[in-house]
Amino acid sequence: MKKGIHPEMKLVTVKCACGAEHKFYTVKENVRIDVCSSCHPFYKGAGAAGMIVDTEGRIEKFKKKYNLE
């Protein structure tokens, strides 16, 4: 990498709207976010486990369409 052309990375504390704080490196001085892993429904258990996937009849429709048994 060339010296002097890349921005300097800084360790900053990011504050979420829920009040949680996370630290990571960025070129910005401060960062504010609305949703983080502490308050997002997917990470709180309402995501993958709480999602309802409608697959009723799709496999049967596919098999019927292509004459598969």
Curated annotation (Swiss-Prot):
It holds the Pfam family Ribosomal_L31. This is Large ribosomal subunit protein bL31. Binds 1 zinc ion per subunit. InterPro entries: Ribosomal_bL28/bL31-like_sf, Ribosomal_bL31, Ribosomal_bL31_A, Ribosomal_bL31_sf. Its cofactor is Zn(2+). Keywords: Metal-binding, Ribonucleoprotein, Ribosomal protein, RNA-binding, rRNA-binding, Zinc. Binds the 23S rRNA. The gene is rpmE. Zn(2+) binds at residues 16, 18, 36, 39. One of its GO terms (cellular component) is ribosome. One of its GO terms (molecular function) is rRNA binding. Belongs to the bacterial ribosomal protein bL31 family. Type A subfamily. One of its GO terms (biological process) is translation. It comes from the Bacteria. Part of the 50S ribosomal subunit.
